[in-house]
Amino acid sequence: MISWELILALAVYNFIMYATPGPNNSILTASGIKFGFIRSIPNILGIPTGHGLQLALVCLGLGSLFIKYPILFDVLRYVGSAYILYLAYKMFGSLNISKTEDRSRPLNYYEAILFQFVNPKAWVICSTAVTLYYPKNENILVGTLFMVVMSTIVNIPSISIWAYGGSIIRQYLVMRS
């Protein structure tokens, strides 16, 4: 049986990890500024979907590969960092809030899912959460489902704040221009 103490501890951990600055929240803030909250919703929904898949893989044993072959995490870190720099260039380089025609678009649902697999912070969140909060005496499927559901429930409101904050900044910038 999963205790209320474990549920509360995992919820607090998830909130702290998802609500603090990182690649996802930077992209969501930029998306909120550039495109507004509504157009950022596919990105907001793709992040917990991708992170849930990633977390399930770690719960089901992928994390042991990182322990056995630490170079995999180094490769992931460099590839992820390069991709994050590319996205930063793309997003922040195009933060023009003009009323003229603009072909840029926010990350879509599938791009947000895939981004989780090159996001170093997301891998750290998964590895740490499974190490500290995985319910030890549960069936592997029940434990994995618990971790993924808890992650998703906390993730969506925690990251939505960043896109909403970006949309507030957008309103201010539009008023000033």
Predicted regions and their residues:
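Flexible cytoplasmic inter-helical loops of multi-pass small-molecule transporters
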Residues: 93-107
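Selected transmembrane alpha-helices and immediately adjacent juxtamembrane segments
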Residues: 116-126
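A short amphipathic helical element positioned immediately N-terminal to and/or at the very start
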Residues: 109-117
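Juxtamembrane transmembrane-helix termini in multi-pass membrane transport proteins
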Residues: 2-71, 128-147, 163
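Selective transmembrane alpha-helices of multi-pass membrane proteins
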Residues: 67-96, 154-162, 170-177
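Short loop-to-helix capping motifs
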Residues: 22, 36, 119-120, 175-176
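Hydrophobic transmembrane alpha-helices of secondary-active solute transporters
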Residues: 17, 115, 154-155
